[in-house]
Amino acid sequence: MRVNNGLTPQELEAYGISDVHDIVYNPSYDLLYQEELDPSLTGYERGVLTNLGAVAVDTGIFTGRSPKDKYIVRDDTTRDTFWWADKGKGKNDNKPLSPETWQHLKGLVTKQLSGKRLFVVDAFCGANPDTRLSVRFITEVAWQAHFVKNMFIRPSDEELAGFKPDFIVMNGAKCTNPQWKEQGLNSENFVAFNLTERMQLIGGTWYGGEMKKGMFSMMNYLLPLKGIASMHCSANVGEKGDVAVFFGLSGTGKTTLSTDPKRRLIGDDEHGWDDDGVFNFEGGCYAKTIKLSKEAEPEIYNAIRRDALLENVTVREDGTIDFDDGSKTENTRVSYPIYHIDNIVKPVSKAGHATKVIFLTADAFGVLPPVSRLTADQTQYHFLSGFTAKLAGTERGITEPTPTFSACFGAAFLSLHPTQYAEVLVKRMQAAGAQAYLVNTGWNGTGKRISIKDTRAIIDAILNGSLDNAETFTLPMFNLAIPTELPGVDTKILDPRNTYASPEQWQEKAETLAKLFIDNFDKYTDTPAGAALVAAGPKL
């Protein structure tokens, strides 16, 4: 007997989940809305209705990803290809897991899900049918099903009829691993992957982003091995078909800056770049909402309506939302299907080749200029450096801005060595004749953050070509080409030295930051190509 138009208990038994009598298969948004607001639910399962029509949920103590609890099974599939945390100079979160410990964790999750009423969502990761992953998500929590329905690409009825999953995600958020110490793991919580079984297991953390970023890590493994760029970036396209991609870590402005009324959105966070052009991995957006206002970010604000899902925001008794309240976390979020943004690429989230590549950084030191034009070598250097300030609350335990270097602007999600991503990106850029820029959305010498208004004007100047035609001067030490003036931008802020009481103050901070860049890049100098790029970085 097929249950709910899709799945039999016998199919779940193949994954180790038994005694399931009620499967809610690919639930509609209306059904999820009813399920989330069910008054009989308790704890983190229960949603709250807000005045904007969206349901808000609380993800518990995990208000961001837990990178220290991420593991990958080390076996014949992955041993010689994965970028391991315990090999080489590079620092990453890809900790090896033995097949035996994997079986134990799998047993914990399948035991948790067995005998329960389960939500099963089948969806695609990747807008290109040739390279997409067909993913099956299994959870006992309605809002987690809602999250993946928002964030991944929703199949048509015809596609569902022939759906065969390439990857299984079993979310056992309610279970933990009591044997973690004996197994040499970080804690009782776990986010584990097995490339041979094509499966992800989640235990202990309720944070929805573990499912989203888990599949991103898998695409980051599979695509570059086929010569396809896999990128932690947003992307949009202009009226003339000109495509721009925006790289950057969480909170640097990827979603905000790519959501532009003058351009159609391809996607806000994860993309591939193949022989046909740039394509989205996702079917939704996951926007930060801290200090969100309708005036500053109208597209995102207006996307928060029925079917959107808010996380960790403060909801007052009357259902209104206090977007300024970061007492729970600075990493408050909303997920929504991409069609909640009016100006999107339809019907499929993909476009042609990118001609503008923008690296977004939030410089906590106030040293880097608001914008600079990069040479080919500087493009590779700054891509591999991936400098930003880690912004409050996107990972557990980080509440103040601290400088960080994250290879390819997404080291946490890289499955291969960073140089492999740089090589693929450079090949794609060269073939398309693309130009790269470094844009600082962070702070300057005044201690204030560069305004969204100024940053938007800078992005406009990049996209309409006026920056390429502008006169430039060179910022010492970092050797960056800075425009002398740009339309709509306060000229005084273009040279970061002007925002300090004295040039010596900038010089002092610049030397500190330059040393951090140089020390960080040392890990790439063990190859001739990496050593050759040192000259493109800052010099003391």
Swiss-Prot record:
Its annotated pathway reads: Carbohydrate biosynthesis; gluconeogenesis
The principal location of this protein is cytoplasm
Signal peptide limits:
none
Annotated GO biological processes are: gluconeogenesis
Please list the cofactors this protein needs.
Mn(2+)
Q: Where does ATP bind?
A: 213, 232, 248-256, 297, 333, 449-450, 455
List the Gene Ontology MF annotations in alphabetical order: ATP binding; metal ion binding; phosphoenolpyruvate carboxykinase (ATP) activity
InterPro entries linked: PEP_carboxykinase_ATP, PEP_carboxykinase_C, PEP_carboxykinase_N, PEPCK_ATP_CS
Quote the cofactor binding remark.
Answer: Binds 1 Mn(2+) ion per subunit.
Q: What EC number(s) is this enzyme filed under?
A: 4.1.1.49
Q: What family is this protein classified in? A: Belongs to the phosphoenolpyruvate carboxykinase (ATP) family.
Q: How does it assemble?
A: Monomer.
- Give the protein's recorded name: Phosphoenolpyruvate carboxykinase (ATP)
**What is the taxonomic lineage of the source species?**
Bacteria, Pseudomonadati, Pseudomonadota, Gammaproteobacteria, Enterobacterales
